[in-house]
Structure formats: structure tokens, C-alpha cells
């Protein structure tokens, strides 16, 4: 059982994991009059009345113009910045756009992001650099980053994770969240269904690599999962209770990442497929889908790997490469290599623990309780109208397979993808999993 969201906000508590957890987010306003509450809530957060409002051209129309009007009527000084699209359908969160925004953000008392993933991350990142608090007005239930202190930008072509700051407040209007473009909601569902797999990966890192683990954070959305995992038809029907549960699950996941200080509670090997597709697009200019929609496919893929791993009684380590595929990564090779090289010592430790046999069964016992089977995840996404095939994200089989065969190289933290390579399941399983689970 978890605390309700209101009690969790602006709290510090001692956890059974041995750590003291702090939730710096002070306000969550999920109400039809959330825009009207902006001036009063922001006044309680900061002393001054200068706000930088950041949006894109779509979210400006949805809520940005009205937010600016309400704040100015309440005698706030509003400086508005519209983040430009990159020519492929929307803005991107990368080092170039960050520099662009940083150069244009004036001195202010607080920054307000109006939008979803990219706008939220760029505002969070830039406000953190300028030592200014920020709040976010969410326009769709599209990802778990609203309440997270992390940002996942592309820097020098590589998708990485950096620490920034959590918002002081989150605002959302239920009718806007429910009626948001449906592909955005399905992106949020893709991010949410990843949680059981990412938690299994967290257990893997805890047992094999000594990473700290918090059961409270691992179970933080358990009571919400039935609303969308067991009743995905309610998502496609846009039932308010289901959409609210999905939005809350995303908020809780972000809070878990904030209080732990890493992305471990909500991001594991299942996210790497999406990150790799994004990185490939940054090189060749091909279009990619929304992060969460790609994560949905990555979650099915990782779940299918777990299904194979669970059948292994006595693990045997196979040779693994201590280098990356430089030809494939091209201009990104140097940065990818730096990440991968940092993982090699941990891969050696994993092999040592697999050889001694003492860690394998505790891992299986715990991970089997967590990981959902690929059939359940695929059924959930399909029934909800979310992407569950490579065609559904506008990707070819060849491109998806290429991403699957290289995704283990991009991050220094080991995941179930690395374990599948060590156990000899990869690379041969990649094409088989795509054909069985991600084709139709």
C-alpha cells in the first residue's frame, strides 16, 4: 500500500530501505480550473512575479495563450518562448536546442513549461542551469518525466541521462488530458507498462551489481496498474478514471525516480530500444515515433527475453565483446564507446556471480514475480490502441532488428539486454522475438 499523492507531496520520510526520501514537489493541481489556480499557486512558490512561459506551437494553442492571459491579468510579468520544431514534426531535447533556449531565457523568478516531454525536459534543464525553480502545466499523459528530476537529452548524438530538478508544482486539466491526441496517451501507456520490467532490471542490478534497491519505490504504482493493464479497453474509450489512473501512474513513477536519484525505478533495458532508434534518427534523419510508443515495443522485447531467461536452470557465460560496432555508430562511435567501456567491469562481475551460482536463483525468484509476460503486455497495448508492432511505429523490420542488436552498447548501466548477450540468448533471439511478438 502506498501513500496517497497529496500526503506524498512536499514530504520527507524514513524508508525501510534505510534511506530518507524527500519529495520536493509541493503542489499537484488536477482540476478543470487548474489554469485559474496558476497565479495563486505560483505566488505561494516564489516571492517575485516574473515567469518565463515555455511552450511549442501546439501547446501554446492548447493552454499557453490562456495561461499567459491569466497570469498577466494577475499582474505577473510573462516572458513567453516558443520552442521551434526541428523539421520532423516537433521540437527535440538535445544540446543544440538547450543552448538555444538557454540564450533566450531571461532572468526570472520561476519557469513554467506548458506541454509534455520535450518542452518539460528543456524547461526543467534550462531552469536548473539558471538556478530557477520551475513548474509544469501538462497537456497530455504522455510520459513519466513530469515529476522526475531527470532529463534524457541527446548530447553529442548520444541519448544520456542527466540530473536536473523536479518541478515545484504540476498542473493539469482533466478534460485536456482525456481529450489529448490519442497517440500521446498511448505513448504514456507505453511508458507505464514498462514499470514491471524496469523493476525486474532493478532487482538484477541490485543482486548482481550491488545497486541500491528500494521496495517502496519499486511498488509505488502497483495499486494503479489494474486500471490500464487489466482494463486497456478503458484507455481507448478514454474513460476518465482510466486516463487519470494512467496519469497518476506516470506521476508516481517520476516521483520514484526523483527520490531515488536515478531512473532505475522506471527505466531499464526495455527503454534502450527507443533510445537507440532516436539516436539512429539523429544520424540519418529518418523519422521516429514518440518515446513511449517505442518503449512499448521495447517492453514486449525485454519481456520476451525474460521469458527465455527464466527457462535457464544453470547459466553459462558466453564470450561478450569488449567494444562497440564503430562502423554502425559512425559519428557517434566515440561517445557510445565511452559509455560502453564503463560497463565492461560490471559485466565481468556479473559473469563471476553467474559462475558461482549463488545469485541466480534469488534473481529468478524475484524477477519472476515482477516481469509481465510478453503476451499480456502486447495484448494490453493492442487492446488500448497503442503501438505494438514495428509497423505501428513507422519502422521497418530491418531497422528495428538493427536497433535491437546494438541497443546494449549505449549505456554504462547493465540491463537484461546485457544478460541476454552474456547467456548466449542474443543475438539469435532478436529476429525471432520481432517475428513472433512485434510483427502483427
Where are these regions (language model features)?
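Gly/Ser/Thr-rich loops at beta-strand to alpha-helix junctions
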Residues: 32-35, 57-64, 115-120, 141-142, ...
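A short, small-residue-rich loop immediately preceding and capping a beta-strand
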Residues: 104-126, 130-140
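ATP/NTP phosphate-donor binding region
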Residues: 1-110
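Active-site segments that bind and position negatively charged phosphate/pyrophosphate groups
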Residues: 220-368, 372-376
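A glycine/threonine-rich phosphate-anchoring loop and its flanking beta-alpha core
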Residues: 125-227
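Non-transmembrane, aqueous-exposed alpha-helical and coiled segments at domain scale
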Residues: 89, 94-107, 141, 260, ...
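C-terminal charged capping/lid subdomain of soluble metabolic enzymes
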Residues: 2-15, 192, 308-440
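Solvent-exposed alpha-helices and their adjacent loops that cap or buttress functional pockets
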Residues: 20-22, 45-46, 103-106, 127, ...
Amino acid at each position: 500500500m502506498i501513500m496517497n499523492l497529496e500526503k506524498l507531496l512536499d514530504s520527507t520520510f524514513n524508508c525501510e530501505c534505510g534511506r530518507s526520501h524527500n519529495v520536493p514537489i509541493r503542489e499537484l493541481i488536477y482540476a478543470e480550473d487548474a489554469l485559474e489556480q496558476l497565479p495563486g499557486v505560483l505566488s505561494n512558490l516564489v516571492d517575485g512575479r516574473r515567469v518565463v512561459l515555455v511552450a511549442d506551437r501546439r501547446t501554446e494553442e492548447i493552454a499557453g495563450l490562456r495561461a499567459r492571459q491569466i497570469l498577466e491579468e494577475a499582474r505577473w510579468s510573462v516572458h513567453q518562448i516558443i520552442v521551434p520544431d526541428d523539421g520532423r514534426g516537433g521540437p527535440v531535447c538535445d544540446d543544440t536546442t538547450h543552448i538555444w533556449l538557454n540564450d533566450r531565457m531571461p532572468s526570472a523568478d520561476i519557469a513554467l513549461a506548458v506541454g509534455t516531454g520535450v518542452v518539460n525536459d528543456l524547461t526543467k534543464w534550462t531552469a536548473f542551469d539558471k538556478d530557477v525553480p520551475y513548474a509544469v502545466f501538462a497537456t497530455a499523459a504522455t510520459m513519466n518525466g513530469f515529476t522526475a528530476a531527470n532529463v534524457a537529452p541527446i548530447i553529442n548524438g548520444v541519448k544520456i541521462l542527466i540530473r536536473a530538478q523536479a518541478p515545484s508544482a504540476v498542473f493539469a486539466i482533466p478534460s485536456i488530458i482525456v481529450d489529448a491526441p490519442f497517440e500521446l496517451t498511448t505513448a504514456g501507456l507505453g511508458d507505464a507498462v514498462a514499470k514491471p520490467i524496469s523493476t525486474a532490471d532493478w532487482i538484477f542490478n541490485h543482486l548482481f551489481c550491488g545497486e541500491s534497491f528500494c521496495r517502496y519505490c519499486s511498488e509505488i504504482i502497483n495499486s494503479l496498474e489494474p486500471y490500464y493493464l487489466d482494463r486497456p479497453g478503458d484507455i481507448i474509450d478514454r474513460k476518465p478514471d482510466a486516463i487519470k489512473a494512467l496519469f497518476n501512474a506516470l506521476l508516481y513513477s517520476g516521483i520514484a525516480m526523483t527520490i531515488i536519484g536515478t531512473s532505475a525505478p522506471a527505466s531499464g533495458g526495455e527503454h534502450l530500444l527507443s533510445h537507440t532508434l532516436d539516436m539512429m534518427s539523429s544520424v540519418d534523419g529518418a523519422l521516429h515515433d514518440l518515446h513511449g510508443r517505442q518503449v512499448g515495443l521495447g517492453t514486449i522485447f525485454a519481456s520476451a527475453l525474460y521469458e527465455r531467461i527464466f527457462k535457464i536452470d544453470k547459466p553459462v557465460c558466453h564470450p561478450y565483446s569488449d567494444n562497440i560496432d564503430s562502423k554502425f555508430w559512425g559519428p557517434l562511435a566515440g561517445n557510445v564507446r565511452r559509455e560502453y567501456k564503463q560497463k565492461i567491469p560490471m559485466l565481468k562481475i556479473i559473469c563471476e556471480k553467474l559462475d558461482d551460482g549463488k545469485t541466480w536463483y534469488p534473481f529468478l525468484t524475484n524477477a519472476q514475480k515482477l516481469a509481465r509476460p510478453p503476451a499480456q503486455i502486447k495484448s494490453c497495448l493492442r487492446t488500448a490502441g497503442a503501438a505494438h508492432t514495428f509497423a505501428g511505429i513507422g519502422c521497418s523490420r530491418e531497422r528495428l532488428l538493427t536497433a535491437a542488436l546494438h541497443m546494449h552498447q549505449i549505456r554504462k548501466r547493465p540491463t537484461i539486454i546485457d544478460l541476454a548477450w552474456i547467456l548466449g540468448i542474443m543475438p539469435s533471439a532478436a529476429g525471432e522475438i520481432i517475428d513472433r511478438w512485434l510483427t502483427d
